[in-house]
Design a protein with these regions (language model features):
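Alpha/beta-hydrolase active-site loop
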Residues: 110-133
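Short, surface-exposed "cap/lid" segments of acyl-processing enzymes
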Residues: 45-94, 98-105, 228
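The feature captures the conserved acid-bearing segment of alpha/beta-hydrolase catalytic domains
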Residues: 181-258, 264-294
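Alpha/beta-hydrolase fold nucleophile elbow
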Residues: 132-146
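Hydrolase active-site cap/lid region
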Residues: 155-197
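Hydrolases whose catalytic domains are alpha/beta-hydrolase-1, hotdog thioesterase
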Residues: 149-153
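Structural alpha-beta junctions
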Residues: 9, 91-97, 134, 246-259
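Beta-strand-enriched, solvent-exposed domains that form extended recognition/catalytic surfaces
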Residues: 1-45
């Protein structure tokens, strides 16, 4: 990275690229980010991972009071690069990890190469090992795009609970819905389809959808509690909850749900309220932690 010192006045930054010779030049995205120099990425203690294809995610670990559970929050779609949910997670006092995906425009749903996905699991497992926790002392959570990260990595980590709001699961269908269901809205979904499948045909839509379902159908989530707040008229992934419930029921997972009227981007305040309520409920019931909000 190129470090530009802060200035007391407004200015512009321009980038020029010069190339000479024969071959193919690939130019990726240019990112402008706050620097903490050697003290962290974005915030003090923040870290960045990049795989062999320069696909990256960022993560931050806070040890809290060193008592279970370890709460992991996957950031939702956001064009402003950085961490999401810091103060919300910190108020719970428990150890937590923030994970964010700054790829494409707003995030690529935490899917990637084998090394990329293994690195996300390793970040979580290393924190569990540091704290001396087992996987049944882990909660994965996220809203919207972050819900996919929580649900997807739950199939690999077998946490105590998964807490999600506005779940998005069928990523191929989300891209396909841009034709008629929500024209010109969330074009990033097409980029995600092409990133993972190299094309945007109907076959690619089905294959990307099936990527998640193959994972969850070959996992054991019988000891995991799922708390899900979903939109009744979701125009991104309308049947996400209806598709997920039979699979979780078959695995004898415990499911707590709240249906909220509206489309995907409606009534975020109510969804967030239920998301936090689910956290308080599970932390008290499973771990004996009574938060200030429930006293």
């Amino acid at each position: 990275p190129i470090e530009l010192p802060a200035r007391p006045y407004q200015t512009y930054v321009s980038v020029s690229i010069k190339a000479k010779g024969k071959g193919t030049l690939f130019i990726g995205a240019i990112h402008k980010r706050w620097s903490r120099l050697e003290l962290g990425q974005f915030i003090l203690g923040g870290k960045r991972y990049s795989d062999e294809n320069k696909q990256e995610f960022i993560h931050y670990f806070h040890p809290g009071d060193l008592k279970p559970p370890l709460n992991v929050y996957f950031s939702g779609y956001r064009t402003a690069e950085g961490f999401e949910g810091y103060f919300m997670m910190k108020r719970m006092n428990a150890p937590f990890i923030l994970i964010a995906d700054p790829r494409i425009e707003g995030g690529a749903f935490y899917l990637g190469s084998e090394n990329y996905e293994q690195a996300i699991r390793k970040v979580i497992q290393n924190a569990l090992d540091y704290l001396g926790f087992a996987n049944n002392q882990l909660i994965l959570s996220g809203l919207s795009m972050g819900s996919f990260g929580a649900l997807y990595y739950a199939t690999k980590l077998n946490p105590a609970a998964v807490i999600v709001g506005k779940p998005l699961i069928n990523l191929g269908t989300i891209a396909n819905n841009m034709k008629l269901v929500r024209p010109n809205d969330f074009g990033t979904s097409l980029d995600i389809l092409r990133l993972n499948q190299n094309d945007i045909t109907n076959k690619d839509v089905v294959q990307l959808d099936n990527h998640f379902w193959k994972q969850i159908q070959h996992s054991d989530l019988s000891m995991t509690t799922f708390a899900i707040a979903y939109m009744e008229h979701d125009d991104y992934d309308k049947y996400a909850f209806q598709d997920l419930l039979p699979v979780l029921t078959k695995q004898h997972a415990r499911v707590i749900s709240k249906r909220i009227p509206g489309r995907h981007n409606d009534d975020s305040a109510t969804v967030t309220h239920w998301f936090i309520n689910f956290y308080h409920l599970i932390m008290e019931e499973r771990f004996g932690r009574v938060t200030h909000a429930r006293r």
